[in-house]
């Protein structure tokens, strides 16, 4: 779905005036944009058949819409200029994996791991990219390769050479007794680039490669014997990534429109998709302001900051307007103050993805009464994505994400001591957010290509530059 905000007057005015004044002012804002899932895509059969059957044709059509010499696009220029007079990263090409994009007639069956599929079953370990750590050959598992995702190993963890990311994932799964589901065929490819896409298949691969549950449990038992030390360590981690600063970032960019409630929300003569696009366009301008308030983000190299913002903007915007909409009945509340009702979304042909936002995000957030500190931590986890393509130091980003995990866990234990499973429930919203974000991004590209929906300048520029989906 799309995000929330007002339409930007003129790109020249907005980008030069707004960003040069506010982005240097250490403010921060991000919202989460979710675009529309089409229920009636058959209305464009010819176009769909010719242009949307594969990544090559999509790229060709998109590139043809870009102005010459503008390969990097406005988001790079605006974000980079707001962070300092540094050189911009080299432009990259929109390079989807070597397979066909999911057919648009199955958009409603979105999967968080549908982009790339290996041969059925874990036999995919025998593929060329996995031969370095094939099956039962200990010699093949070098100390430099993670047996789960192929990233650089940091040592042997729970019986298997693995990276810090897979080690932490396996430990959290066992300690929190998390149960995952695969939205696809339980045969998702797990590699460095997309290890976070399907938690079920990642966990199954951890087990298949030999990670031992009992090793985590034994480690936990030992840690209980050192509870004082652990408490001190947790306190130290919370100080490194203070939840107060994360909350401040959320409040600093809060559009302050909750007062509308369910009654008295402004109506609009525009269709829902147009309203959402306009709202998303405005919220994108506050993305940098929010991110710069998140601890340690501004300490990363400029190029990495740009990559992380561009890799996560859609999920960040979606999370924001979903949380903002918990008090709305059967609809979402945009940052512009406009209310988009479920019925109008269905009439506009975007009912399917709209319903997913309501049931998988808004409803869940409402049921658990998710507060803004928890929302901010989840969005910070999305922001610090070590799998974003092109990072100069993915390990550093991974470490920052782990700090946010620790901060969120500590916060939930202190604030909600009677809800021991709350931390796990919060983390389980991330796969749904990723899945919905990817599908909304596909629909945003579709709306852009068919030209039926006005997408404001900044959002259009964002789409015309390569987007790192990893």
Curated annotation (Swiss-Prot):
Keywords from the UniProt entry: DNA-binding, Metal-binding, Nucleus, Receptor, Transcription, Transcription regulation, Zinc, Zinc-finger
DNA-binding feature ranges: 146-211
Residue ranges, compositional bias (Basic and acidic residues): 217-229
Domain NR LBD: start-end pairs: 238-466
Subcellular location: Nucleus
First and last residue of the signal peptide: none
GO molecular function, one term: nuclear steroid receptor activity
Pfam family, one: zf-C4
Region Disordered, annotated ranges: 217-242
Example of a GO biological process term: retinoic acid receptor signaling pathway
Zinc finger (NR C4-type): 146-166, 182-206
GO cellular component: RNA polymerase II transcription regulator complex
Region feature Modulating, mapped onto this chain: 1-145
Major localization listed first in the record, in broad terms: nucleus
SUPFAM superfamilies linked to this entry: Glucocorticoid receptor-like (DNA-binding domain) (SSF57716), Nuclear receptor ligand-binding domain (SSF48508)
PROSITE patterns: NR_LBD, NUCLEAR_REC_DBD_1, NUCLEAR_REC_DBD_2
Region (Hinge): 212-235
CDD domains to which the protein is assigned, alphabetical: NR_DBD_RXR, NR_LBD_RXR_like
Domain comment quoted from the record: Composed of three domains: a modulating N-terminal domain, a DNA-binding domain and a C-terminal ligand-binding domain.
Its biological purpose: Receptor for retinoic acid. Retinoic acid receptors bind as heterodimers to their target response elements in response to their ligands, all-trans or 9-cis retinoic acid, and regulate gene expression in various biological processes. The rar/rxr heterodimers bind to the retinoic acid response elements (RARE) composed of tandem 5'-AGGTCA-3' sites known as DR1-DR5. The high affinity ligand for rxrs is 9-cis retinoic acid.
Assembly information from the UniProt record: Homodimer. Heterodimer; with a rar molecule. Binds DNA preferentially as a rar/rxr heterodimer.
The family this protein is said to belong to: Belongs to the nuclear hormone receptor family. NR2 subfamily.
Protein name: Retinoic acid receptor RXR-gamma
Source organism of the structure: Xenopus laevis
């Amino acid at each position: 779905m799309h995000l929330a905000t007002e339409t930007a007057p003129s790109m020249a005015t907005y980008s030069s005036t707004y960003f040069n004044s506010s982005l240097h002012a250490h403010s921060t804002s991000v919202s989460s944009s979710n675009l529309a899932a089409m229920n009636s895509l058959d209305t464009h059969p010819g176009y769909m058949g010719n242009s949307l059957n594969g990544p090559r044709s999509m790229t060709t059509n998109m590139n043809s819409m870009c102005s010459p010499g503008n390969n990097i696009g406005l988001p790079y220029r605006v974000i980079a200029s707001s962070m300092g007079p540094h050189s911009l990263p080299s432009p990259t090409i929109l390079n989807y994996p070597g397979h066909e994009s999911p057919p648009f007639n199955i958009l409603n069956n979105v999967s968080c791991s549908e982009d790339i599929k290996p041969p059925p079953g874990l036999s995919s370990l025998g593929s060329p990219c996995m031969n370095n750590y094939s099956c039962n050959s200990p010699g093949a598992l070098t100390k430099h390769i993670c047996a789960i995702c192929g990233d650089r190993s940091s040592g042997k963890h729970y019986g298997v050479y693995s990276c810090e990311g897979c080690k932490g994932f396996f430990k959290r799964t066992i300690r929190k007794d998390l149960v995952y589901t695969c939205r696809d065929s339980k045969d998702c490819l797990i590699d460095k680039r997309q290890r976070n896409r399907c938690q079920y298949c990642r966990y199954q691969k951890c087990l298949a490669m030999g990670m031992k549950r009992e090793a985590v449990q034994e480690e936990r038992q030992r840690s209980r014997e050192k509870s004082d030390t652990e408490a001190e360590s947790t306190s130290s981690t919370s100080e490194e990534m203070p939840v107060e600063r994360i909350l401040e970032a959320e409040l600093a960019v809060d559009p302050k429109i909750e007062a509308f409630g369910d009654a008295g929300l402004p109506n609009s003569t525009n269709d829902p998709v147009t309203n959402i696009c306009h709202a998303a366009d405005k919220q994108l301008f506050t993305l940098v302001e929010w991110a710069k308030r998140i601890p340690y983000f501004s300490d990363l190299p400029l190029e990495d900051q740009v990559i992380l913002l561009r890799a996560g903007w859609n999920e960040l915007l979606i999370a924001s307007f979903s949380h903002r909409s918990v008090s709305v009945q059967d609809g979402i509340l945009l940052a512009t103050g406009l209310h988009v009702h479920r019925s109008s979304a269905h009439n506009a042909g975007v009912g399917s993805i709209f319903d997913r936002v309501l049931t998988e995000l808004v409803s869940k957030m409402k049921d658990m009464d998710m507060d803004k500190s928890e929302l901010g931590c989840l969005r910070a986890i999305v922001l610090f994505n070590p799998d974003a393509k092109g990072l100069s130091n993915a390990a550093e980003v991974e470490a920052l994400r782990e700090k946010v995990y620790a901060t969120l866990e500590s916060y939930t234990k202190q604030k909600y001591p009677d809800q021991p499973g709350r931390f796990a429930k919060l983390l389980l919203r991330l796969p749904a957010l990723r899945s919905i974000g990817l599908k909304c991004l596909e629909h945003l590209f579709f709306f852009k290509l068919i030209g039926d929906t006005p997408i404001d300048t900044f959002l259009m520029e964002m789409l015309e530059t390569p987007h790192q989906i990893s």
